């Protein structure tokens, strides 16, 4: 599917020491480190949220959130992987009632360890089953799709690859940019492992490097390289382009986006989502907070601020030229399986990519 308009090194230290499976599950937009969560307030007098999404995004919603919950809300910001690892280390002593993750992998890890509470059908039914936990213990709140950014001065639209697997072909030698240390790229590779298998993914990574793909620090740097013509293609999340267009105007942005067809691994949709923690004494307040985050007001806010797709039924994005969510040809995958990021990191290290 071709459409016309086309965050930070992985958390390894703290999360890796606490839970190897989470070592690579870093947040793209996290604020301060997970240590900020350690001094959360009294859970009996307020709701405490551990948030892998940053303060700049969450703070404007706090007033409305407290009204919806009916009590004071404290938010502790950090990297999603580190926060999830901290929750597992704290066990029933955790002061968090709600975990708001930047990605599905961290939620999948908590679900796997039995730390999330089953959610009521009324909450689950607000989100398509593809974007919630298979055990019914977390839901996605907003989605982002992997795309190819391309420079139309360097490559014609009708010559674009139909699969991310094709960027290792000779015609794309030295022409592809990617961000191997970025959490979103690592989640994409994890998705490829789930969909295509470890052997095929390992071969693709080896071929990607051999084909001269250029590594950059993050998605924005990849987009910059596409813009300048340094590379013809870039592997990124969709919203970086839309944020740049909102800032500069489409006529000032050279790059365009290619939404891959056919349920390609390169069209993976990952989500930011949330789950209610078990045995914290905050279940009722946490559930109210989660339902607020699925409300039209909150969903519209996230869509407008992040350019991500709202996931609650009945809410659509107002972002100009963003393809309808239903039109995306994303692969069928259990997003909870993205928790196996440690294996991905090992694979990337073996290929000399991180």
Enumerate the language-model features and the residues they cover.
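Extracytoplasmic ligand-binding site segments that recognize negatively charged/polar headgroups
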Residues: 51-59, 78-82, 94-231, 265
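C-terminal motif of bacterial Sec signal peptides marking the signal peptidase cleavage site
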Residues: 20-24
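Periplasmic-binding protein-like
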Residues: 144, 175-180, 205-209, 215-216, 251-278, 292-315
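Early extracytoplasmic/lumenal segment of secretory-pathway proteins
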Residues: 26-29, 35-108
């Amino acid at each position: 599917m071709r459409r016309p308009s086309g965050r930070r090194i992985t958390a390894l230290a703290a999360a890796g020491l606490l839970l190897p499976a989470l070592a690579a599950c870093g947040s793209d937009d996290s604020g301060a480190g997970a240590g900020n969560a350690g001094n959360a307030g009294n859970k009996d007098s307020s709701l405490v949220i551990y948030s892998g999404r940053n303060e700049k995004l969450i703070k404007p919603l706090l007033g409305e959130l407290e009204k919806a919950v009916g009590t004071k809300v404290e938010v502790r910001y950090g990297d999603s992987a580190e926060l999830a690892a901290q929750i597992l280390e704290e066990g029933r002593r955790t002061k968090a009632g709600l975990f708001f993750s930047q990605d599905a992998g961290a939620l999948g890890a908590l679900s796997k360890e039995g730390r999330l509470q089953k959610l009521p059908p009324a909450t689950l039914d607000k989100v398509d089953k593809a974007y919630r936990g298979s055990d019914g213990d977390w839901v996605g709140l907003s989605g982002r799709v992997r795309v190819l950014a391309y420079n139309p001065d360097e490559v014609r639209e009708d010559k674009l690859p139909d699969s991310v697997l094709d960027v290792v072909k000779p015609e794309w030698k030295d022409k592809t940019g990617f961000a191997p240390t970025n959490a979103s790229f690592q989640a994409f590779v994890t998705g490829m492992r789930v969909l295509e298998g470890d052997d095929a993914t390992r071969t693709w990574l080896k071929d990607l490097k051999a084909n001269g793909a250029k590594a950059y620090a993050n998605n924005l740097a990849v987009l910059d390289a596409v813009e300048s013509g340094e590379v013809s293609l870039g592997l990124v999340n969709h919203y970086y382009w839309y944020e740049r267009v909102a800032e500069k105007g489409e006529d000032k942005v050279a790059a365009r986006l290619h939404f891959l067809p056919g349920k390609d691994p390169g069209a993976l949709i990952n989500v930011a989502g949330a789950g209610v923690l078990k045995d914290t004494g905050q279940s009722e307040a946490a559930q109210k907070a989660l339902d607020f985050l699925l409300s039209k007001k909150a969903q519209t806010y996230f869509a407008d601020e992040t350019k991500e797709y709202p996931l609650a039924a009945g809410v659509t994005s107002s972002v100009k030229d963003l393809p309808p969510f239903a039109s995306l040809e994303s692969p069928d995958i259990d997003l909870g399986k993205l928790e196996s990021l440690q294996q991905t990191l090992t694979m990337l290290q073996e290929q000399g990519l991180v």
